[in-house]
C-alpha cells in the first residue's frame, strides 16, 4: 500500500521533488520536497484509496475508536470520508480557539470520555498533530493515536509523538517516495543522496 500511495501522490503532483532547486516552506525551511495533499481532493480514485488505507490503519491499530477527528484544515475532508464510511461521529480541531461566538477549538461531536483517532494529511515535525491531541485531551477525550497520509520521517516527529505518548501511523513515507521516484526515473542517484542528506540534516 505504501508504494501505491507514494506513486499516486507523485503522479498527481501532490508531492513534488526538486533536489537542485529548493522549495521554501512557510516556516522558512529550504526543502527539496513539497507536499500538498489537498490536491488529492480533486482525484476521486486517489482520495478513495487514501480513505480506505486510513480506515485499514484505524481498524488494525485503533479498533475501539468512537470518534474520528480531523485537523483543520487539511485533515478535515479525509476525516469526513472516513467517518462516513465507518458510520462514526466526527469533529475537527482548530489550531487555536475562535475569537468569537463560543470560542470553540473543537467543532462537531462531543469528545468527553470518548476514544478518538486524529486524522492528519501530513506529518513533518508532529507539532500540529500534538496540538490537536492536547486540545482533545483537554476536552476529556481519550486520544488513541494519529493516522496520516504521509510523513517526512523526521526524527523530530518521533520525539514529539513519543514525548506525548501518542502512536502514529502513515500510509506512506519519505523513503518509499524516494524509492518510487527512483524506479520511475524521476530522480538520479545523486538526487537520492541529496534527498537523504536533507532529511538526515533536518532531523
From Swiss-Prot:
Q: Does this UniProt record's set of keywords contain Endoplasmic reticulum?
A: no
Pathway membership, UniProt: Pyrimidine metabolism; UMP biosynthesis via de novo pathway; UMP from orotate: step 1/2
Q: Which GO terms describe its biological process?
A: 'de novo' UMP biosynthetic process; pyrimidine nucleobase biosynthetic process
Q: EC number(s) for this protein?
A: 2.4.2.10
Among Pfam families, the record links this protein to: Pribosyltran
Q: Which domain of life is it from?
A: Bacteria
Q: Which InterPro entries match?
A: OPRT, Or_phspho_trans_dom, PRibTrfase_dom, PRTase-like
GO MF annotation list? magnesium ion binding; orotate phosphoribosyltransferase activity
This protein's cofactor list reads: Mg(2+)
Where along this sequence does the record place binding of 5-phospho-alpha-D-ribose 1-diphosphate? Answer: 94, 98, 100, 120-128
Q: Catalyzes what?
A: orotidine 5'-phosphate + diphosphate = orotate + 5-phospho-alpha-D-ribose 1-diphosphate
Q: Which CDD domains match?
A: PRTases_typeI (cd06223)
What keywords are annotated for this sequence in UniProt? Glycosyltransferase, Magnesium, Pyrimidine biosynthesis, Transferase
Q: Which residues bind orotate?
A: 124
User: Subunit comment for this entry?
Assistant: Homodimer.
Primary role: Catalyzes the transfer of a ribosyl phosphate group from 5-phosphoribose 1-diphosphate to orotate, leading to the formation of orotidine monophosphate (OMP).
UniProt similarity note: Belongs to the purine/pyrimidine phosphoribosyltransferase family. PyrE subfamily.
By what name is this protein known?
Answer: Orotate phosphoribosyltransferase
Query: Species name for this entry?
Result: Staphylococcus epidermidis (strain ATCC 12228 / FDA PCI 1200)
